[in-house]
Amino acid sequence: IVSTATATSSETKISNEETLVVTTNRSASNLWESPATIQVIDQQTLQNSTNASIADNLQDIPGVEITDNSLAGRKQIRIRGEASSRVLILIDGQEVTYQRAGDNYGVGLLIDESALERVEIVKGPYSVLYGSQAIGGIVNFITKKGGNKLASGVVKAVYNSATAGWEESIAVQGSIGGFDYRINGSYSDQGNRDTPDGRLPNTNYRNNSQGVWLGYNSGNHRFGLSLDRYRLATQTYYEDPDGSYEAFSVKIPKLEREKVGVFYDTDVDGDYLKKIHFDAYEQTIQRQFANEVKTTQPVPSPMIQALTVHNKTDTHDKQYTQAVTLQSHFSLPANNELVTGAQYKQDRVNQRSGGMTSSKSLTGFINKETRTRSYYESEQSTVSLFAQNDWQFADHWTWTMGVRQYWLSSKLTRGDGVSYTAGIISDTSLARESASDHEMVTSTSLRYSGFDNLELRAAFAQGYVFPTLSQLFMQTSAGGSVTYGNPDLKAEHSNNFELGARYNGNQWLIDSAVYYSEAKDYIASLICDGSIVCNGNTNSSRSSYYYYDNIDRAKTWGLEISAEYNGWVFSPYISGNLIRRQYETSTLKTTNTGEPAINGRIGLKHTLVMGQANIISDVFIRAASSAKDDSNGTETNVPGWATLNFAVNTEFGNEDQYRINLALNNLTDKRYRTAHETIPAAGFNAAIGFVWNF
């Protein structure tokens, strides 16, 4: 398997039968026999990457798109048209939940590649084994767990001209007797993004991470302890060509994830019971959010003439998560492999906010200032039972069936606020609210492997996303607007169908899937019209008020393919996604949902093997068709685009322990923006990296 500097190869093609994955079965199995569409970014691809963001390593996987919410340092991913809030993020199979998530954004990818062994991406809502949020899919970051000698490691440094930024990382791992370990750390400092129109302000960011793994093996027993931390500082890019704002800033000076996890596995090797797995973790996500908006608008009144409105908000929130999972693996008669388990998870969120709003007229007739403080406490608990059975009921035939039962409970335990206006103090206290739900979701897959080098599959799966605490109970402010939670929200649901084929023969590597999904009760933000949920507020030209509600239905049709031919000196490859998506509300039905109908990558690779060096080169085009969106009442259009790129990796040394990676991106200096990124893409840029394996 050959990887390239921009994460082309191993994640966009079928790996061989030796590639093991764990996400689809909660136990190690080869990728070839996976019951779902899954693709893997291996460690070599991660080492060869010169991307500044780990999200960019996923962008060429069919069905995956990048979104940024105007935050250059917090890129997220969408899968099969579903927003990042509907993509489940796992680290070693443990959820990274985010109760502050809205309808179009999630927690992000708060991990650094220095800790990673590989990344597994499952397309579709196969959440039976892992839980809610996976209508779009699952991204499981698998960390390194040790080595086969006393000490080995990787040192990596990358310079990127697009941001004039550096990234450095180191990871050391090894084993001593029955113990194994891994220590890793990274630091990244990226400047403002360089585009064909110059560098963009407010697109710089920094992040750093540290991690430790300690393991102990004794006979059939394996114990593990993981500690990791990731910290990010970034801010929002905005365009104001008309000078509408006197001041505008949205900053996240701190977004930090800290986690402690414990793991235990044992091989029972009984008549039926074969393995037992236990894991538990505590995770904290802290965020600081600062927002300032100042505008002046003319008013046709001689007593006012012009009105200046100035808003400032500072929010600190902290989410504390505790979770535990117990799982058993049985080998039953008649070729049945059964996984059963139970899971408990609790998220607790504390949020405190301070704000200032002032209104001043040019004449001085209006001069009003209001200061506010608020404090919220809320929590969500989930209990679930799950089971999945693989039954090989005939030669070449395997039937996988899974089920998961949820019991969820959310409640607002405290909601206090105080405001000061012209010496008058007003106190508010929200009533304690609660919401609960119980749901059973299922999945099934039928696989046939009776043809040489060919695996066929048909699958059905249900998706389920329960509203976050922010969507249910909290009042949030950003960009001069206020959004109210709604305790009457229902969970989002989806039914999904898929036909797929994998082929590995005659120098061809092909993975393809046709998929269809129907989703309902999508949660979206609506304009306030004076209703109770909005505290009687109404949206206007001077004040923006929104609230969450279930309004949308969606249908999605798609075709994914990744193919590579290795029978020539130059290996052609292609990966892409064809998608059509339809939204439907009580007042609207449209297929213009902002999705490019076609996007993907096509290229040629070449490997030159010499005495003391291997040179792997890759020239490719990355492209997407135009995208139109009129689902929000206003029409937006994103033109289609295509970029020409070149990457080369050079391995040298007695054991190929040194590696130089060079990527020349956007060679024609194309001016463009992707469909789901609000920040314009970088122009022509070069990135160079050095890797030392020891």
Where are these predicted regions, by residue range?
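Acidic, small-polar-rich N-terminal luminal/periplasmic segments of exported/outer-membrane proteins
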Residues: 4-149, 164, 464, 499, ...
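Transmembrane beta-strands of outer-membrane beta-barrel pores
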Residues: 157-163, 176-178, 187-191, 218-220, ...
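Transmembrane beta-barrel wall of Gram-negative outer-membrane proteins
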Residues: 159-189, 199-237, 252-269, 332-333, ...
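Flexible loop and strand-edge segments within Gram-negative outer membrane beta-barrel domains
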Residues: 190, 196-197, 203-205, 222-275, ...
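Outer-membrane beta-barrel signature, preferentially recognizing the C-terminal barrel domain
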Residues: 242, 246-269, 374, 378-380, ...
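Signature of Gram-negative outer-membrane beta-barrel scaffolds
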Residues: 338-452, 575
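Gram-negative outer-membrane beta-barrel transporters
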Residues: 392-399, 407-408, 507-511, 515-519, ...
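C-terminal beta-signal and adjacent terminal beta-strands/loops
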Residues: 464, 515-521, 525, 622-630, ...
